[in-house]
């Protein structure tokens, strides 16, 4: 049973007590809850015993983790259940590869919060983050570029991108940006 944590640390925390904010709610996590949340903060982890599974289920009820099955597309499926948000960073593009910079630019400079499926779509189609798609004034143009008659139906984009050739590449990019503290999962 794999999982990944959602939310952001709001106050200085330790490994024993963690202050997390997610969707307008503030949580104080201690003990196994804090440990499990921290272990999934920058990538996927798994519960190793019954106590951790119990803590993981409690975190899921709180909305602080997404649990997925241990299959190839499991990480992608989990990431489709979150929103990708920019983290506060002084020099967000410094030290990143070209592909990471492209993904980060899509995540941080569009006028909307992208889903994982939308990011996979943009990268799969080799659509560059040009000025005409970035910013609040260009949201409609970006939405029209992503959502066509073939992708507008409920969950069709998520399902199509699950079979995309670059799906795993984009999952690795997102996890790399998460580890480098350039994005947060909302």
State each model region's role:
Residues 1-42:
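Short, amphipathic alpha-helical interface elements at domain boundaries
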Residues 25-186:
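Long, charge-rich, low-complexity alpha-helical segments
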């Amino acid at each position: 049973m794999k999982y990944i944590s959602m939310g952001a640390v709001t106050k200085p925390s330790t490994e024993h007590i963690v202050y997390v904010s997610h969707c307008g709610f503030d949580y104080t996590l201690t003990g196994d809850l804090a440990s499990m949340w921290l272990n999934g903060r920058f990538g996927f982890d798994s519960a190793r015993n019954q106590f951790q599974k119990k803590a993981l289920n409690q975190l899921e009820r709180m909305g602080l983790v997404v649990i997925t099955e241990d299959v190839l597309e499991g990480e992608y499926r989990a990431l489709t259940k979150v929103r990708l948000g920019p983290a506060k960073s002084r020099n967000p593009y410094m030290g990143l590869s070209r592909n990471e910079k492209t993904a980060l630019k899509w995540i941080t400079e569009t006028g909307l919060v992208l889903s994982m499926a939308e990011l996979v779509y943009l990268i799969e189609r080799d659509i560059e983050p040009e000025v005409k798609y970035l910013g609040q004034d260009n949201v409609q143009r970006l939405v029209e570029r992503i959502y066509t008659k073939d992708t507008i139906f409920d969950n069709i984009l998520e399902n199509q991108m699950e079979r995309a050739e670059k799906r795993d590449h984009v999952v690795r990019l997102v996890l790399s940006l998460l580890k480098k503290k350039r994005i947060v999962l909302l």
